[in-house]
Amino acid sequence: MTDNVVERRSAAAGIDVCTLKRPPANALGLPIIEGLHAALDEAAGAKVVVIASEIPGFFAAGADIKHMSTVDAKSFTEYGDKLRGVLDRLAAADKITIAAVDGLALGGGLELAMACSLRVGSASAKFGLPEVKLGLIPGAGGTQRLPRLVGRGRALDIMLTGRQVPAEEAHAMGLIDRLVPAGTAEKAALELAGELIAASLPAQRAVIRTVDAAFDLPLEQGFRYEVEQEQELFESGEAAEGLAAFLEKRPPRFG
């Protein structure tokens, strides 16, 4: 992997961890972008992937500002396209992804966390999109994903001020899904992964698709899409296995 700044390991059957390890703050430059692509390639067989950090005090601190200050507009746009590309790949992955956030998740770091299916944040975590303080806007999905998680008003508050949101407030507004003691985000994310691994991954992915569609489709179309997803699961055999396992009082053997 690129400069070994993203390390993938198997934590348990079907569960992988991709650890960011680019001192001092996991700046999301090309090494981490390329490293994430490589890690996702290696995690192709996993059902759940946890994104974590080994850098104390940081999940990821966004773009490499020192480097970005030296490039022209074309190069800056190309960098943004590459960052959005890996985050969009993460968001569309055929698995459940969990961001385990201890410390700061700022700018692209928060955008990385928001691209995951779920977010576990520790009490020491802080979140922010401070791009307006640099004369920019969040450009790797932040303006689109944050309102979906916390609503328009809260999203504007966070983005227009560029302030850092403490973990307790982030949990209350829905920016993170589970709040855990400081230093335990990765452990808690792996425990959550253990809960998730027992269910049908195709059904879980269908839930994500259907919930995401709720933001874009009129209600009646959303209902129809829900029925379509359920029918596909029934025809695929996932539902048949789940129902049979329930009646036979045994763990399901999902594909």
Q: Whereabouts are the PLM-identified features?
A:
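C-terminal long alpha-helix characteristic of the crotonase
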Residues: 120-125, 176-224, 231-237, 253-255
